[in-house]
């Protein structure tokens, strides 16, 4: 008994390419027999060609073009028999002819006489879009579309089959061509209303606002909540801000620095690349494709005492941290808020 998991045979096409190995039938006889077997699909053209292999055994190749699409689910449906010997059965390999022009050229390439060839009907030259045409069409879509929606609509109209099975890939391309605009951060407080410890000020001037021939150092700030850490860090310029999780799909290549805010050490991917201001590192976003991050910019890491990274690090990780960052633990009463500037206003700083 055949296994139920065996693949089901089916050929569904207007155009068929048949090969009968070791077939001694005359091409004209095979052609006439196939016209009868395929009559319900309204054949338009049939070419049957006998080919002698090096060992002298004859093979029969047949190209069939039908008006209607043939649905063949029985691999024995096109078996042929000899009139003189009904027990001699010739079984074909049945395939869809994806390119009729190529198949016709292939089966007639070495025919040495009309005796080995039989044709009936008028050959239908089926034009199939070449790779160059498809590339040109896709290039035109990319260059002329002005939004994600327009790009996807044009792809759907031009490549409906590919669109139906590769929609996720086309959506990824659309997001790459037309990314979401980077939101401009508006500081919660004027820069003049924020202050920082001299150690932090020194780091800012040396590693954030000046060029360095080597790699910049990052800064690690551990301190209580609601002391203005985040407000100060986000007021320094264009940056990538990550809170709760690191999402590389929103990475801005024009940012001057990164901020990692309230993310536990164990949940910070590529932490060495961030801390060490490394260049050209590869990331693998959970819901996106791998991408190369240009990097080379310092990072501000902000944590509260209950999630102190250094407490969770091995000695080797701690050594890397101290070698690549300025570590600052806020002292009691330290704040980034300049209360004298606030002049008695009700100031509530984040973080």
From Swiss-Prot:
A motif (RCR-1) lies at residues 17-20. Residues 173-185 are annotated as: Oligomerization. It comes from the Viruses. Belongs to the geminiviridae Rep protein family. The lineage of its organism: Viruses, Monodnaviria, Shotokuvirae, Cressdnaviricota, Repensiviricetes. It is found in: Host nucleus. A motif (RCR-3) lies at residues 106-109. Keywords: ATP-binding, Covalent protein-DNA linkage, DNA replication, DNA-binding, Endonuclease, Helicase, Host nucleus, Hydrolase, Metal-binding, Multifunctional enzyme, Nuclease, Nucleotide-binding, Nucleotidyltransferase, Repressor, Transferase. Its cofactor is Mg(2+); Mn(2+). This is Replication-associated protein. Residues 10-123 form the CRESS-DNA virus Rep endonuclease domain. Essential for the replication of viral ssDNA. The closed circular ssDNA genome is first converted to a superhelical dsDNA. Rep binds a specific region at the genome origin of replication. It introduces an endonucleolytic nick within the conserved sequence 5'-TAATATTAC-3' in the intergenic region of the genome present in all geminiviruses, thereby initiating the rolling circle replication (RCR). Following cleavage, binds covalently to the 5'-phosphate of DNA as a tyrosyl ester. The cleavage gives rise to a free 3'-OH that serves as a primer for the cellular DNA polymerase. InterPro entries: CRESS_DNA_REP, Gemini_AL1_CLV, Gemini_AL1_REP, Gemini_AL1_REP_central, P-loop_NTPase. There are 3 rolling circle replication (RCR) motifs. RCR-2 is probably involved in metal coordination. RCR-3 is required for phosphodiester bond cleavage for initiation of RCR. It comes from Wheat dwarf virus (isolate Sweden). SUPFAM superfamilies: Origin of replication-binding domain, RBD-like (SSF55464), P-loop containing nucleoside triphosphate hydrolases (SSF52540).
